[in-house]
């Protein structure tokens, strides 16, 4: 979710390097002369490898351009924003990080679901729902099933059935409330509520 600071930087951008799954209305803040470069990926299909993105950011910055890197979701939560920042700094480029509001909290809130609530959940965890080694992730989910608190799984739709199965096999009651939210910031927004036993999209 964007902030006023982010919108102000977009107005000044000479180059915008942007991801998939962003709110396209944000690009309306850019001036007409801004060079817009799409580097997104979806479902494992990359328009550009991460190393190429790093090199592109460095190249444009070395041209003296004011570059804005607009990442989908939270750039520092499973978003590789830290890798890009470290690459640029290691090559002598000054960076400024302008945080938005993390989707892990904002999207559930938009759906009327607080991640913590008195007498229900006093903590929450954020877990990736997609990784190269899914077997180890399922094992981690099973092992964490005994923990209290709200679990937020980002990018987990493809593996929803396996995630819920891992939670139940780890000891979470089947009637534990669950929700699936997709398209949190665009017109594809959809929410489905249920339990671990029956949730599906």
Listing of model-derived features with the role each one plays in the protein:
Residues 4-101:
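Class I S-adenosyl-L-methionine
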Residues 26-27, 88, 107, 163, ...:
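Hydrophobic packing residues within well-ordered alpha-helices of enzyme cores
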Residues 4-9, 31-34, 83-87, 113, ...:
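Short, solvent-exposed amphipathic alpha-helical segments in soluble enzyme
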Residues 1, 44, 131-132:
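Short, glycine-rich nucleotide/cofactor-binding loops
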Residues 34-41, 92-96, 115-122, 171-180:
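Short hydrophobic/aromatic-enriched beta-strand-loop microsegments
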Residues 72-147, 190-193, 197:
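Class I SAM-dependent methyltransferase SAM-binding "motif I" and its flanking Rossmann-like core
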Residues 17, 68-69, 126, 152-154:
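Structural motif
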Residues 62-67, 131, 135-201:
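A contiguous loop/helix-start segment that scaffolds small-molecule binding in enzyme catalytic cores
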């Amino acid at each position: 979710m964007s902030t006023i600071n982010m919108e102000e930087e977009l107005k000044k951008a000479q180059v915008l390097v942007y991801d998939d799954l962003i709110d396209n209305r944000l690009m309306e803040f850019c001036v007409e002369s801004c060079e817009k470069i799409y580097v997104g990926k979806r479902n494992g299909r990359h328009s550009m490898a991460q190393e190429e993105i790093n090199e592109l950011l460095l190249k444009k910055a070395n041209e003296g351009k004011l570059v804005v890197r607009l990442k989908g979701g939270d750039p520092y939560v499973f978003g590789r924003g830290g890798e890009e920042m470290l690459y640029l700094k290691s090559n002598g480029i000054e960076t400024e990080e302008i945080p938005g509001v993390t989707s892990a909290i904002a999207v559930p809130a938009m759906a009327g679901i607080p991640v913590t609530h008195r007498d229900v959940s006093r903590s929450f965890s954020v877990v990736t729902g997609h990784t190269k080694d899914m077997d180890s992730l399922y094992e981690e989910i099973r092992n964490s099933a005994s923990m209290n608190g709200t679990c937020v799984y980002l990018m987990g739709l493809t593996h929803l059935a396996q995630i819920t199965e891992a939670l139940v096999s780890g000891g979470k009651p089947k009637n534990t409330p669950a929700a699936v939210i997709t398209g949190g910031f665009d017109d594809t927004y959809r929410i489905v509520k249920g339990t671990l036993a029956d949730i599906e999209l």
